[in-house]
């Protein structure tokens, strides 16, 4: 079979959620971010696993994502939508009982006129300049917005992956200035904010990347293994090139495995002649260019060529691969292609 297998450990995701939950006080609720199809790992199954672990609030990017998660979970858990109440979202918000995080005065007006009485939250801009009501806007609308009974006041940290960055304290101060005394539950922290400490936790945290094994949660359990099938093996003589543009040439007689995955499957071309795959625990260098559907790997040192080689797993996390590619683990995870066969179960040692 020429289809790669992406193994996703739901128990590890649940364990990561519990570990992050235990870092906060008992009166602080821990939500879960399942946007972008749970960072590419399958929101329906991931949300079920997190609900079993105890999560009761889920966060998605769009109302369409929220509808998918509601179909998977049924009634009960709250599903919050970061993009708020966009034009055309009214029916989805109503029919799937979604809670939009309203980001602007236009969105407040739209929501109150179309769905007065429907739950909502408010996103405030504490300095990231991306989404949310700015301090001046919030001052103008806070009175009637709070009177309408928001479920949550939230903001988002720009630099929480760097605990020493001064922006963290600046945003904390700005958020408190806008929300102290409101009596409404507050949320400022995703994974990085949880790790900053209790001052950033408030009444609700909303971890995302930490659930899926990513930085900055260094103690996270590995969540994914990506095993790529070997299609063909050949002997390459000294001086013979491999792959497009002859970017790699054999310096000695080499055994080269051609493996079924490429940039169409989310493996960036920047991995060309830089990445490492694994046969069990044995590293094998990627040689030549990453092409659309194929990569080539030097397996000369293996006593026997296996049926598959791993590019993600316990020996190489998405963050490790991202370092090699010059990107971030988020991008590696969310780019994992549709051609992979997704399997849910424990990661083999």
Swiss-Prot record:
Substrate binds at residues 130, 292. It holds the Pfam family Ala_racemase_N. InterPro entries: Ala_racemase, Ala_racemase/Decarboxylase_C, Ala_racemase_C, Ala_racemase_N, PLP-binding_barrel. One of its GO terms (molecular function) is alanine racemase activity. Pathway: Amino-acid biosynthesis; D-alanine biosynthesis; D-alanine from L-alanine: step 1/1. Signal peptide: none annotated. The modification N6-(pyridoxal phosphate)lysine is found at residue 35. Keywords: Isomerase, Pyridoxal phosphate. SMART domains: Ala_racemase_C. Its EC number is 5.1.1.1. GO terms for cellular component: cytosol. The active site is at 35 (proton acceptor), 244 (proton acceptor). Catalyzes the interconversion of L-alanine and D-alanine. May also act on other amino acids. Belongs to the alanine racemase family. This is Alanine racemase. It comes from Cereibacter sphaeroides (strain ATCC 17023 / DSM 158 / JCM 6121 / CCUG 31486 / LMG 2827 / NBRC 12203 / NCIMB 8253 / ATH 2.4.1.).
